[in-house]
């Protein structure tokens, strides 16, 4: 089946009110006529309100609804209560966020989030009607030890074991080899495709139908120079973009490359 690609920008810990407005205005100008690719941005949660306002009334033929959708970089498993500093699914929905990143290696590493905890976040998002963007991927040491597939399978199985394979219906997986995140080193298109094919095959062992529709993004130093070649690969359904998402022209090139390759 034809899968509609998704290119998502993860701003990480970057931005300000002024930056958010300026970048979104640039993105709207660059992307207003793009079709055939879903686009989302995940600014810091403090700027979701600013982003929501900036995205409304885009002034093009879409009837006032921007082609760019909102996302977020994290969520808690609790809906409300005494959980200082946390953000709930309902709060994210209140600002129109749809695509929510979970399991990013920076969260797994710096905040000690386990596979099982990430799976709980996945379940909370599904229950709330939001789209989980599940990040998986191996470290450089694991890659060199030939454990890439083992690590990816373990991180996917945490969700399957907790929620069943059907939980991946309408969900997104982002394969981000940790050794490629923010390093300037990217997996080659062939390397990335091999892992993406493994991921899809691993899910297909439980359900072919689920595997065929799940969006599998590549992430890890994706930029305007390497995106087009990555998107020629059959199992790469878009990208989760870090640094390059902070510049409207570069991010637009990536989005347009996905739209061109997959349509």
UniProtKB/Swiss-Prot annotation:
SUPFAM superfamilies given in the database record: Triosephosphate isomerase (TIM)
SS bonds (residue pairs): none
Main location as per UniProt: cytoplasm
Intracellular or extracellular location(s): Cytoplasm
EC number: 5.3.1.1
Binding annotation for substrate: 10-12, 182, 221, 242-243
Assembly notes: Homodimer.
Active site location: 104, 176
Species the sequence originates in: Haemophilus influenzae (strain ATCC 51907 / DSM 11121 / KW20 / Rd)
Protein name: Triosephosphate isomerase
PANTHER family: TRIOSEPHOSPHATE ISOMERASE
HAMAP family: TIM_B (MF_00147_B)
An example Gene Ontology molecular-function term: triose-phosphate isomerase activity
Cellular component GO terms held in the UniProt record: cytosol
PROSITE patterns: TIM_1 (PS00171), TIM_2 (PS51440)
Ranges that cross the membrane: none
Gene3D superfamilies: Aldolase class I
Catalysis performed (reactions): D-glyceraldehyde 3-phosphate = dihydroxyacetone phosphate
Name of the gene this protein is made from: tpiA
Cell membrane as UniProt keyword: no
UniProt similarity note: Belongs to the triosephosphate isomerase family.
Function: Involved in the gluconeogenesis. Catalyzes stereospecifically the conversion of dihydroxyacetone phosphate (DHAP) to D-glyceraldehyde-3-phosphate (G3P).
GO BP terms in the entry: gluconeogenesis; glyceraldehyde-3-phosphate biosynthetic process; glycerol catabolic process; glycolytic process
